[in-house]
């Protein structure tokens, strides 16, 4: 591991302060049989089970944009998983885990949700 010691860090122009981006990955794991109970999380304050396989998570720190990349992976051999979030916002993320691709029916199951993007 390296150590960086500096009194001042400046941008490439030599005089202005460096603009640092505040990027992070949001990660949560929920068992969704009765509620979106968090087993492990980063930047997620709580989870809500909105009905069969339909979960939403409140973020501790808002994202800078509602257009973020979200991936949901179930811990079972199902046909597919996806995001059902028609009303995106910067303070929460919604995860829908789909059991049957033919009927589009949701099913409660343990899953991992990962969201990437810039914090506000």
Predicted regions and their residues:
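Intrinsic low-complexity, repeat-rich intrinsically disordered segments enriched
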Residues: 1-40
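Extracellular attachment/recognition segments
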Residues: 26-120
């Amino acid at each position: 591991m390296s150590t960086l010691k500096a009194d001042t860090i400046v941008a490439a122009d030599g005089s202005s302060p460096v603009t640092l981006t505040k990027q992070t990955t949001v990660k949560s794991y929920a068992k969704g049989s009765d509620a979106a109970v968090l087993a492990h999380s980063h930047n997620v304050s709580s989870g809500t089970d909105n009905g069969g396989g339909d979960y939403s998570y409140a973020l501790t720190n808002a994202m800078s944009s509602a257009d973020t990349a979200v991936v949901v992976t179930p811990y079972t051999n199902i046909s597919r998983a996806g995001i059902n979030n028609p009303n995106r916002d910067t303070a929460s993320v919604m995860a829908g885990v789909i059991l049957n691709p033919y009927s589009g029916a949701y099913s409660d199951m343990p899953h991992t949700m990962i969201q990437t993007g810039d914090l506000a």
